[in-house]
Amino acid sequence: DLTHAFDRHTIYWPTDTGGFKKTTVWEGQTEGGYYYSAYAYASAEHGGTHLDAPIHFAADRPTADKVPLARLFGPAALIDLQPSAASDPDALLSEADISAFESAHGPIAADSIVLVRTGWSARWPQRKAYLGDDTPGDASKLHFPGVSAEAARVLVARKVAAVGIDTASIDHGPSKDFMAHRVLLDAEIPVFENLTALDKLPARGAWVVALPMKIGGGSGGPLRAMAILPRKR
């Protein structure tokens, strides 16, 4: 399971101060003598483990409900950025990192789902540790790893199906131009953010299934992501 549970601890982008709200419609015994529970919830699209649909940063691109299913499952290529992230909280996946991965594990095939492991999910749900700052409404002082524009362009050239990361954004915390978002989403490559448990995956051999809520006209939405691990021999 690559998904953080949605609850009162769920981390959202700092400018969204609403958080995740769950209210009880009914919980307990009914007049009929049986137990029944039902709840209502409210959430922004871009919080917790979620999808960024192409429309999020690229005009006239697919909305959440129009992302092709073929982009939401496929073979994983997991690139480990943890060594860089351990010494630099603003580390960026580089073109050289992709080249090193391919030298060790072979070319990234078209329709792969590329996952970037930074180790940041271990900081969840501590907002300041995870985001680098916990000032409500202020996204100007964030620090966490991400993907460089150059690396994003390489992944577009590889014709990958999707790109995911275990941080709050595919762009690193200090980004002001969000070029990784712009490059990937303009190419209609969806992004999965706030993933977890990437430490359980091998560099090659896993399959990823990442199914978002089908929000009509949405720019993203809550995501249930999972990996199917290769059989041990």
Regions found by a protein language model. Name each.
Residues 1-233:
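Active-/binding-site microenvironments in catalytic and ligand-binding cores
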